[in-house]
From Swiss-Prot:
The gene is pyrB. This is Aspartate carbamoyltransferase catalytic subunit. It holds the Pfam family OTCace. L-aspartate binds at K99, R184, R239. PROSITE patterns: CARBAMOYLTRANSFERASE.
Amino acid sequence: MTPIDAKRPLQLNDQGQLRHFLSLDGLPRELLTEILDTADSFLEVGARAVKKVPLLRGKTVCNVFFENSTRTRTTFELAAQRLSADVISLNVSTSSTSKGETLFDTLRNLEAMAADMFVVRHSDSGAAHFIAEHVCPEVAVINGGDGRHAHPTQGMLDMLTIRRHKGSFENLSVAIVGDILHSRVARSDMLALKALGCPDIRVIGPKTLIPIGIEQYGVKVYTDLAEGLKDVDVVIMLRLQRERMAGGLLPSEGEFYRLFGLTTARLAGAKPDAIVMHPGPINRGVEIESAVADGKHSVILNQVTYGIAVRMAVLSMAMSGQNAQRQLDQENAQ
Protein backbone atom coordinates (compact mmCIF):
# COMPACT_ATOMS: atom_id res chain seq x y z
CA MET A 1 0.00 0.00 0.00
CA THR A 2 1.62 3.24 -1.13
CA PRO A 3 0.47 6.48 0.55
CA ILE A 4 -0.90 9.04 -1.89
CA ASP A 5 1.16 11.85 -0.43
CA ALA A 6 4.74 12.06 0.63
CA LYS A 7 5.75 15.07 2.69
CA ARG A 8 3.57 17.97 1.61
CA PRO A 9 5.17 21.41 1.84
CA LEU A 10 1.81 22.65 0.55
CA GLN A 11 0.39 22.15 4.05
CA LEU A 12 2.89 24.52 5.68
CA ASN A 13 3.83 28.14 5.18
CA ASP A 14 7.42 29.36 4.78
CA GLN A 15 7.78 29.50 8.58
CA GLY A 16 6.67 25.90 9.08
CA GLN A 17 3.20 26.83 10.36
CA LEU A 18 0.06 25.01 9.31
CA ARG A 19 -1.81 26.65 6.41
CA HIS A 20 -3.79 23.67 5.04
CA PHE A 21 -4.60 20.41 6.84
CA LEU A 22 -4.76 17.65 4.24
CA SER A 23 -2.97 14.64 5.71
CA LEU A 24 -0.81 13.70 8.68
CA ASP A 25 1.81 12.21 6.37
CA GLY A 26 5.10 14.07 6.72
CA LEU A 27 3.96 16.50 9.41
CA PRO A 28 6.57 16.82 12.18
CA ARG A 29 5.96 15.53 15.68
CA GLU A 30 6.30 19.06 17.06
CA LEU A 31 3.40 20.30 14.92
CA LEU A 32 1.16 17.39 15.91
CA THR A 33 1.96 18.08 19.56
CA GLU A 34 1.13 21.77 19.03
CA ILE A 35 -2.27 20.78 17.63
CA LEU A 36 -2.92 18.59 20.68
CA ASP A 37 -1.77 21.29 23.10
CA THR A 38 -3.92 23.91 21.38
CA ALA A 39 -6.92 21.57 21.43
CA ASP A 40 -6.36 20.96 25.13
CA SER A 41 -6.55 24.70 25.73
CA PHE A 42 -9.87 24.90 23.85
CA LEU A 43 -11.61 22.18 25.87
CA GLU A 44 -12.61 24.63 28.59
CA VAL A 45 -14.48 26.79 26.05
CA GLY A 46 -17.16 24.09 25.89
CA ALA A 47 -17.76 24.43 29.63
CA ARG A 48 -18.38 28.18 29.52
CA ALA A 49 -21.79 29.81 29.70
CA VAL A 50 -20.91 31.62 26.46
CA LYS A 51 -19.05 29.09 24.35
CA LYS A 52 -17.15 31.51 22.11
CA VAL A 53 -13.71 32.99 21.58
CA PRO A 54 -13.07 35.71 18.97
CA LEU A 55 -10.17 34.14 17.06
CA LEU A 56 -11.98 33.82 13.71
CA ARG A 57 -14.34 36.77 14.02
CA GLY A 58 -15.00 38.22 10.58
CA LYS A 59 -13.88 35.02 8.81
CA THR A 60 -16.12 32.72 6.76
CA VAL A 61 -15.77 28.95 6.94
CA CYS A 62 -17.44 26.88 4.21
CA ASN A 63 -18.28 23.23 4.94
CA VAL A 64 -18.46 21.45 1.57
CA PHE A 65 -19.48 17.84 2.19
CA PHE A 66 -19.91 15.58 -0.82
CA GLU A 67 -20.38 12.57 1.47
CA ASN A 68 -22.89 12.14 4.27
CA SER A 69 -21.67 12.93 7.76
CA THR A 70 -23.15 13.63 11.18
CA ARG A 71 -20.32 13.92 13.70
CA THR A 72 -17.67 15.42 11.43
CA ARG A 73 -19.88 18.05 9.84
CA THR A 74 -21.59 19.01 13.11
CA THR A 75 -18.35 19.26 15.07
CA PHE A 76 -16.72 21.37 12.35
CA GLU A 77 -19.74 23.69 12.44
CA LEU A 78 -19.57 23.95 16.23
CA ALA A 79 -15.80 24.45 16.13
CA ALA A 80 -16.07 27.34 13.65
CA GLN A 81 -18.96 28.91 15.56
CA ARG A 82 -17.08 28.70 18.86
CA LEU A 83 -14.22 30.56 17.17
CA SER A 84 -16.80 33.24 16.16
CA ALA A 85 -16.56 32.53 12.41
CA ASP A 86 -19.49 32.78 10.03
CA VAL A 87 -20.34 29.28 8.80
CA ILE A 88 -21.84 28.15 5.49
CA SER A 89 -22.67 24.46 5.05
CA LEU A 90 -23.23 23.44 1.44
CA ASN A 91 -25.93 20.84 0.88
CA VAL A 92 -24.47 19.04 -2.12
CA SER A 93 -27.71 17.23 -2.99
CA THR A 94 -29.40 20.59 -3.60
CA SER A 95 -26.39 22.42 -4.99
CA SER A 96 -25.33 22.99 -8.57
CA THR A 97 -23.00 19.98 -8.40
CA SER A 98 -26.07 17.77 -8.68
CA LYS A 99 -26.85 19.62 -11.93
CA GLY A 100 -23.46 18.86 -13.47
CA GLU A 101 -21.27 21.64 -12.07
CA THR A 102 -17.74 20.41 -11.36
CA LEU A 103 -16.09 20.46 -7.96
CA PHE A 104 -13.63 23.03 -9.27
CA ASP A 105 -16.40 25.37 -10.48
CA THR A 106 -18.34 25.03 -7.23
CA LEU A 107 -15.31 26.05 -5.20
CA ARG A 108 -14.46 28.91 -7.53
CA ASN A 109 -17.95 30.30 -6.96
CA LEU A 110 -17.60 29.96 -3.20
CA GLU A 111 -14.22 31.64 -3.47
CA ALA A 112 -15.90 34.55 -5.25
CA MET A 113 -18.14 34.92 -2.19
CA ALA A 114 -14.96 35.66 -0.17
CA ALA A 115 -14.88 32.46 1.89
CA ASP A 116 -11.68 32.22 3.92
CA MET A 117 -11.60 28.48 4.54
CA PHE A 118 -13.04 25.31 3.02
CA VAL A 119 -13.68 22.15 5.00
CA VAL A 120 -14.07 19.44 2.37
CA ARG A 121 -15.27 15.84 2.53
CA HIS A 122 -15.23 13.89 -0.72
CA SER A 123 -15.43 10.28 -1.86
CA ASP A 124 -12.35 10.65 -4.09
CA SER A 125 -8.92 10.14 -2.53
CA GLY A 126 -6.79 13.24 -3.05
CA ALA A 127 -9.75 15.62 -3.52
CA ALA A 128 -8.72 17.94 -0.68
CA HIS A 129 -5.17 18.17 -1.98
CA PHE A 130 -6.44 18.98 -5.48
CA ILE A 131 -8.57 21.78 -4.06
CA ALA A 132 -5.70 23.18 -2.00
CA GLU A 133 -3.53 23.32 -5.12
CA HIS A 134 -6.15 25.22 -7.12
CA VAL A 135 -7.87 27.66 -4.75
CA CYS A 136 -6.52 31.17 -4.37
CA PRO A 137 -3.53 31.41 -1.99
CA GLU A 138 -5.48 33.18 0.77
CA VAL A 139 -7.94 30.29 1.29
CA ALA A 140 -7.15 27.52 3.77
CA VAL A 141 -8.34 23.97 3.01
CA ILE A 142 -9.11 21.39 5.69
CA ASN A 143 -9.62 17.75 4.77
CA GLY A 144 -12.77 16.36 6.41
CA GLY A 145 -12.11 12.94 4.85
CA ASP A 146 -11.23 11.94 1.28
CA GLY A 147 -11.99 8.45 0.01
CA ARG A 148 -9.82 5.79 1.61
CA HIS A 149 -6.93 8.21 1.87
CA ALA A 150 -7.01 10.39 4.98
CA HIS A 151 -9.10 11.79 7.81
CA PRO A 152 -6.53 13.92 9.63
CA THR A 153 -8.79 15.63 12.16
CA GLN A 154 -10.22 12.26 13.19
CA GLY A 155 -6.66 11.04 13.60
CA MET A 156 -5.81 13.98 15.84
CA LEU A 157 -8.95 13.72 17.96
CA ASP A 158 -8.11 10.06 18.47
CA MET A 159 -4.61 11.09 19.59
CA LEU A 160 -6.04 13.68 21.99
CA THR A 161 -8.36 11.03 23.44
CA ILE A 162 -5.45 8.65 23.96
CA ARG A 163 -3.20 11.33 25.45
CA ARG A 164 -5.83 12.55 27.90
CA HIS A 165 -6.54 9.01 29.11
CA LYS A 166 -3.02 7.56 28.95
CA GLY A 167 -0.77 10.58 29.32
CA SER A 168 1.97 9.56 26.89
CA PHE A 169 2.41 7.51 23.73
CA GLU A 170 5.89 6.23 24.51
CA ASN A 171 5.01 2.94 26.23
CA LEU A 172 1.64 2.17 24.67
CA SER A 173 0.34 -0.78 22.72
CA VAL A 174 -2.49 0.25 20.39
CA ALA A 175 -4.66 -2.12 18.35
CA ILE A 176 -6.68 -0.96 15.33
CA VAL A 177 -9.34 -3.55 14.53
CA GLY A 178 -11.61 -4.29 11.59
CA ASP A 179 -11.90 -2.95 8.05
CA ILE A 180 -8.38 -1.58 7.63
CA LEU A 181 -8.52 -1.77 3.83
CA HIS A 182 -11.23 0.86 3.35
CA SER A 183 -10.51 3.02 6.40
CA ARG A 184 -9.05 6.51 6.05
CA VAL A 185 -9.21 6.69 9.86
CA ALA A 186 -6.84 3.72 10.18
CA ARG A 187 -4.30 5.40 7.88
CA SER A 188 -4.42 8.68 9.77
CA ASP A 189 -4.23 6.95 13.16
CA MET A 190 -1.23 4.86 12.10
CA LEU A 191 0.65 7.91 10.84
CA ALA A 192 -0.12 9.93 13.97
CA LEU A 193 0.77 7.13 16.39
CA LYS A 194 4.09 6.53 14.65
CA ALA A 195 4.94 10.25 14.56
CA LEU A 196 4.08 10.66 18.25
CA GLY A 197 6.34 7.80 19.30
CA CYS A 198 3.98 4.88 19.94
CA PRO A 199 6.23 1.78 19.91
CA ASP A 200 3.61 -0.95 19.38
CA ILE A 201 0.94 -0.38 16.71
CA ARG A 202 -1.12 -3.42 15.73
CA VAL A 203 -3.71 -3.88 12.99
CA ILE A 204 -6.17 -6.75 13.33
CA GLY A 205 -8.63 -8.04 10.77
CA PRO A 206 -9.38 -10.66 8.15
CA LYS A 207 -6.73 -10.99 5.44
CA THR A 208 -9.17 -9.68 2.83
CA LEU A 209 -9.54 -6.39 4.75
CA ILE A 210 -5.85 -5.72 5.41
CA PRO A 211 -3.98 -3.87 2.63
CA ILE A 212 -0.92 -5.42 1.05
CA GLY A 213 2.25 -3.67 2.21
CA ILE A 214 0.73 -2.12 5.31
CA GLU A 215 3.88 -3.04 7.25
CA GLN A 216 5.53 0.08 5.76
CA TYR A 217 3.56 2.06 8.35
CA GLY A 218 5.55 0.36 11.10
CA VAL A 219 2.69 -1.84 12.29
CA LYS A 220 2.33 -5.49 13.27
CA VAL A 221 -0.38 -7.45 11.46
CA TYR A 222 -2.67 -9.94 13.19
CA THR A 223 -5.48 -12.02 11.73
CA ASP A 224 -6.48 -13.47 15.11
CA LEU A 225 -8.33 -11.07 17.42
CA ALA A 226 -7.37 -12.72 20.71
CA GLU A 227 -3.69 -12.74 19.81
CA GLY A 228 -3.74 -9.14 18.60
CA LEU A 229 -5.54 -7.79 21.67
CA LYS A 230 -3.21 -9.38 24.20
CA ASP A 231 -2.07 -6.77 26.75
CA VAL A 232 -2.98 -3.72 24.63
CA ASP A 233 -3.65 -0.33 26.22
CA VAL A 234 -5.94 1.05 23.51
CA VAL A 235 -8.42 -0.65 21.17
CA ILE A 236 -9.64 1.37 18.16
CA MET A 237 -12.55 -0.36 16.46
CA LEU A 238 -13.40 0.58 12.88
CA ARG A 239 -16.70 0.67 11.04
CA LEU A 240 -17.26 -2.09 8.51
CA GLN A 241 -17.58 -0.07 5.28
CA ARG A 242 -19.93 -2.15 3.18
CA GLU A 243 -20.54 0.77 0.80
CA ARG A 244 -16.88 0.70 -0.33
CA MET A 245 -16.54 -3.08 -0.60
CA ALA A 246 -16.39 -5.19 -3.72
CA GLY A 247 -18.10 -8.56 -3.59
CA GLY A 248 -16.36 -11.50 -1.96
CA LEU A 249 -14.30 -9.61 0.63
CA LEU A 250 -16.50 -10.77 3.50
CA PRO A 251 -18.84 -13.77 3.84
CA SER A 252 -21.33 -11.94 6.09
CA GLU A 253 -21.58 -9.43 8.91
CA GLY A 254 -22.44 -12.27 11.26
CA GLU A 255 -19.25 -14.11 10.38
CA PHE A 256 -17.23 -10.93 10.85
CA TYR A 257 -18.73 -10.41 14.31
CA ARG A 258 -18.05 -14.02 15.26
CA LEU A 259 -14.35 -13.64 14.48
CA PHE A 260 -13.59 -9.94 14.97
CA GLY A 261 -16.44 -8.34 16.93
CA LEU A 262 -15.32 -6.82 20.24
CA THR A 263 -17.14 -8.46 23.15
CA THR A 264 -16.61 -8.21 26.89
CA ALA A 265 -14.96 -11.64 26.89
CA ARG A 266 -12.53 -10.70 24.12
CA LEU A 267 -11.70 -7.35 25.68
CA ALA A 268 -10.59 -9.22 28.80
CA GLY A 269 -7.41 -10.12 26.91
CA ALA A 270 -6.37 -6.46 26.85
CA LYS A 271 -4.94 -4.65 29.87
CA PRO A 272 -7.43 -4.10 32.73
CA ASP A 273 -7.39 -0.33 32.18
CA ALA A 274 -7.60 -0.50 28.37
CA ILE A 275 -9.76 2.07 26.62
CA VAL A 276 -12.07 1.34 23.68
CA MET A 277 -12.54 3.82 20.83
CA HIS A 278 -14.63 3.97 17.65
CA PRO A 279 -14.84 6.80 15.07
CA GLY A 280 -18.56 6.18 14.49
CA PRO A 281 -21.10 5.46 13.33
CA ILE A 282 -21.14 2.25 15.37
CA ASN A 283 -22.67 -0.91 13.96
CA ARG A 284 -23.69 -2.65 17.18
CA GLY A 285 -23.52 -6.40 16.92
CA VAL A 286 -21.20 -6.14 13.91
CA GLU A 287 -17.99 -4.49 15.13
CA ILE A 288 -18.75 -4.22 18.82
CA GLU A 289 -21.34 -5.39 21.34
CA SER A 290 -23.42 -2.81 23.20
CA ALA A 291 -22.04 -3.87 26.58
CA VAL A 292 -18.57 -2.77 25.42
CA ALA A 293 -19.67 0.34 23.50
CA ASP A 294 -21.56 1.60 26.56
CA GLY A 295 -19.28 0.08 29.19
CA LYS A 296 -16.62 1.42 31.56
CA HIS A 297 -13.78 0.99 29.05
CA SER A 298 -15.51 3.00 26.32
CA VAL A 299 -14.35 6.56 25.60
CA ILE A 300 -16.37 6.88 22.40
CA LEU A 301 -18.38 9.90 23.56
CA ASN A 302 -15.18 11.55 24.80
CA GLN A 303 -13.92 11.32 21.22
CA VAL A 304 -16.89 13.39 20.05
CA THR A 305 -16.28 16.05 22.71
CA TYR A 306 -12.56 16.20 21.99
CA GLY A 307 -13.30 16.40 18.27
CA ILE A 308 -14.72 19.90 18.64
CA ALA A 309 -11.59 21.12 20.42
CA VAL A 310 -9.27 19.50 17.87
CA ARG A 311 -11.16 21.07 14.99
CA MET A 312 -11.06 24.44 16.73
CA ALA A 313 -7.29 24.03 16.99
CA VAL A 314 -6.89 23.10 13.32
CA LEU A 315 -9.14 25.90 12.05
CA SER A 316 -7.43 28.56 14.15
CA MET A 317 -3.90 27.34 13.40
CA ALA A 318 -4.51 27.09 9.65
CA MET A 319 -5.99 30.58 9.52
CA SER A 320 -3.10 31.94 11.55
CA GLY A 321 -0.63 30.27 9.20
CA GLN A 322 -2.37 31.72 6.15
CA ASN A 323 -2.34 35.20 7.69
CA ALA A 324 1.36 34.91 8.51
CA GLN A 325 2.17 33.78 4.96
CA ARG A 326 0.15 36.65 3.48
CA GLN A 327 2.06 39.16 5.60
CA LEU A 328 5.37 37.56 4.63
CA ASP A 329 4.47 37.69 0.93
CA GLN A 330 3.56 41.37 1.24
CA GLU A 331 6.86 42.15 2.96
CA ASN A 332 8.81 40.28 0.29
CA ALA A 333 6.96 42.16 -2.46
CA GLN A 334 8.00 45.56 -1.12
